[in-house]
From Swiss-Prot:
Residues 232-249 have a biased composition (Polar residues). This is Forkhead box protein C2. It comes from the Eukaryota. Coiled coil: none annotated. It is found in: Nucleus. Phosphorylation regulates FOXC2 transcriptional activity by promoting its recruitment to chromatin. SUPFAM superfamilies: Winged helix' DNA-binding domain. The modification Omega-N-methylarginine is found at R279, R293. Residues 386-397 have a biased composition (Basic residues). One of its GO terms (molecular function) is transcription cis-regulatory region binding. It is linked to Lymphedema-distichiasis syndrome: An autosomal dominant disorder characterized by primary limb lymphedema associated with distichiasis (double rows of eyelashes, with extra eyelashes growing from the Meibomian gland orifices). Swelling of the extremities, due to altered lymphatic flow, usually appears in late childhood or puberty. Most affected individuals have ocular findings including corneal irritation, recurrent conjunctivitis, and photophobia. Drooping of the upper eyelid (ptosis) is a variable feature of the lymphedema-distichiasis syndrome, occurring in about 30% of patients.
Amino acid sequence: MQARYSVSDPNALGVVPYLSEQNYYRAAGSYGGMASPMGVYSGHPEQYSAGMGRSYAPYHHHQPAAPKDLVKPPYSYIALITMAIQNAPEKKITLNGIYQFIMDRFPFYRENKQGWQNSIRHNLSLNECFVKVPRDDKKPGKGSYWTLDPDSYNMFENGSFLRRRRRFKKKDVSKEKEERAHLKEPPPAASKGAPATPHLADAPKEAEKKVVIKSEAASPALPVITKVETLSPESALQGSPRSAASTPAGSPDGSLPEHHAAAPNGLPGFSVENIMTLRTSPPGGELSPGAGRAGLVVPPLALPYAAAPPAAYGQPCAQGLEAGAAGGYQCSMRAMSLYTGAERPAHMCVPPALDEALSDHPSGPTSPLSALNLAAGQEGALAATGHHHQHHGHHHPQAPPPPPAPQPQPTPQPGAAAAQAASWYLNHSGDLNHLPGHTFAAQQQTFPNVREMFNSHRLGIENSTLGESQVSGNASCQLPYRSTPPLYRHAAPYSYDCTKY
């Protein structure tokens, strides 16, 4: 093992020591006579020069540098010993003869004899390719002879001592001999090859075992990966681990049939399909706008649609001309019902034709829009009874409330039912069952345009709860204003006052 630790100019800071020329372990005072220190990363041809192989010994005498003679040869110690043995006349040589051959052939090893000679002895004793031969008494001298194992002559590739194939071991040589004998001899006489054949035959069996174990270990994870594409509702309802692994993992199609009513996976029951089927469902078509987040299970609705005359595209508040039918105006706000909340009952007015239908369903919160026979001018408006006071941010407070029109007697019950529906959907905490006369107070309302009603829901203005102190029994709108009412915001064609017509 030769020293590669050398240092460059002592004035140069941060220089890696072994990348320069002079010896690191030189005697003190040797830095004065330095000859041409090298650069750190230079590819100079004198990179393998004098200082690269100088001795470790601090007592080594300072000699003038001879770079060409002191380059370490690119051979391993095993190659050097093999060269010495093969150059001997009898193919055997003593330890001292090996030393002498190396020093004569390579002047690099003429220095630091203690270091490399120790390495030579280690390699002779550790490598099985070198065989120790006892010395004859006939020849003078001392020490045993060293020779090469006959099977180790081909341990270097193509006779080059620069590359060695592998570490020589006698066990490998004996196995190779047995294999060769087994190949040459016929199968009945293969007695020598018997110990080697089970070892070779067991190798593919072990490989098969390994493959089987790997496939078994990987098999439980395969259904989770491959069965994500389950599309049939039967597979989602089975109790097999495949469907149980695939349904929560992300196959939405398998859980769609029971997804709306029960919401088993904790998914919200509201979807785009609900809105689309609300708009285009046939008469009597069932749908369940499941309230998965609100915790309410809503029964399916039967929505029979009536024939829609062209009056659906008329003015928004087409009130009846006679005073007796004061509650019979129709607000055709088709876009508001289906696109702002799918069933937002607070925008629309209910004609008197809905009184009988609503009186059959007194339980408001469980069936908010149960069996509404929609009137001719509404077509899917899904109206609830006059809660236009909830758009309190857009009312005109200057309009004085006229006296309420004579109301038919069965109107309080549908008003309460639809008021509960509005409070259920719009999250109003106040219970509106106590408003008997609040049903069709249509004359007191002044309508802004549809856009302002959209803005009120979009901006979240109508979050105030309706209590008993805020809404009185005579249906006069006494509501606190959360924001400044947008009076005179739009031009005359956009603001409709229902009390003028």
